[in-house]
């Protein structure tokens, strides 16, 4: 029994050391390439040039139960496995290169003066939600879109060791989920997407379902969306939507996207969006509430 305790303690120490090593190697600071936004629940890293949210951490859920541990990541990357997962939005048909126009700890306003488009990323009044507003002064011929871009691989920061809950983590379901007027909950593993999946719907949502925490792009009752999940291209699976019927005289001027990045708490998900609680119905459960 003593040997088992000693071995468990050694494994725990290794896990903690590995976490702090990863913090040091993957640490991103605000500079000419990135802006960091922060509130009580989330820390976000935004790529200035693309406007993508390239990392998110849940501050109230540390990876290790020790002082100095950082929160679990939903979006992020791993140099060891080349894994990447990020959020991107904008207008189809154009590829802006942004600069910072305004920034504070809880929002950033980016603009591309040449194309006349801007993007504001800010925290919503709803916990664990981010508002992303894309706009164009002159109008854009493309559609508004928002998407999750994910390479193949297991979710970041989950324990994999057998004595750390790794058996449940490794067997938990991971895949794209879409909720629409046609079907409240359809899912597909990424590797099984060999042709585009599309559905038109008012409101609804699209998400990548994973254990404990996940990201979802939530639609509005005021718009019709073409939800999609696409086969792997250039190393990434893409899941998201385009906003349909939004153009005025064939031009689109703006849209605000609603992005949830948070824990799987059933009561919260029920109140947040219709059918969003179904994202916790697959695999093993770990109740946070």
Where are these regions (language model features)?
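Short extracytoplasmic/periplasmic juxtamembrane "stem" segments immediately C-terminal to an N-terminal membrane anchor
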Residues: 14-35
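Soluble non-transmembrane domains of integral membrane proteins
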Residues: 38-279
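Intrinsically disordered regions, especially transient/low-confidence alpha-helical propensity segments
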Residues: 4, 202, 281-283
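Short, membrane-interfacial amphipathic segments enriched in basic
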Residues: 277-289
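Subset of Sec-pathway N-terminal targeting signals
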Residues: 1-18
């Amino acid at each position: 029994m003593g040997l088992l305790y000693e071995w468990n303690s050694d494994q725990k120490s290794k896990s903690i050391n590995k976490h702090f090593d990863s913090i040091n190697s993957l640490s991103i600071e605000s500079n000419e390439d990135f802006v960091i936004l922060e509130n009580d629940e989330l820390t976000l890293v935004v790529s200035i040039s693309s406007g993508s949210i390239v990392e998110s951490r849940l501050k109230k859920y540390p990876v290790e139960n020790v002082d100095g541990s950082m929160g679990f990541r939903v979006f992020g990357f791993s140099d060891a496995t080349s894994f990447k997962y990020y959020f991107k939005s904008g207008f189809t048909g154009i590829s802006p290169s942004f600069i910072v126009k305004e920034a504070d700890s809880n929002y950033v306003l980016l603009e591309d003066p040449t194309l006349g488009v801007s993007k504001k990323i800010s925290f919503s009044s709803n916990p664990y939600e981010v508002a992303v507003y894309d706009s164009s002064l002159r109008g854009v011929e493309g559609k508004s879109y928002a998407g999750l871009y994910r390479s193949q691989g297991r979710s970041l920061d989950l324990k994999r060791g057998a004595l750390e809950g790794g058996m449940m983590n490794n067997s938990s379901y991971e895949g794209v989920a879409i909720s629409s007027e046609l079907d409240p909950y359809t899912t597909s593993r990424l590797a099984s997407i060999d042709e585009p999946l599309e559905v038109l719907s008012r409101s609804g949502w699209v998400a990548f379902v994973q254990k404990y925490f996940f990201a979802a792009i939530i639609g509005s009752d005021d718009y019709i969306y073409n939800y999609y999940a696409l086969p792997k291209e250039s190393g990434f699976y893409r899941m998201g939507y385009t906003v349909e019927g939004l153009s005025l005289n064939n031009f689109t001027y703006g849209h605000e996207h609603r992005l949830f990045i948070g824990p799987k708490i059933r009561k919260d998900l029920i109140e947040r969006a219709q059918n969003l609680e179904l994202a916790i119905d697959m695999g093993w459960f770990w109740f946070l509430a």
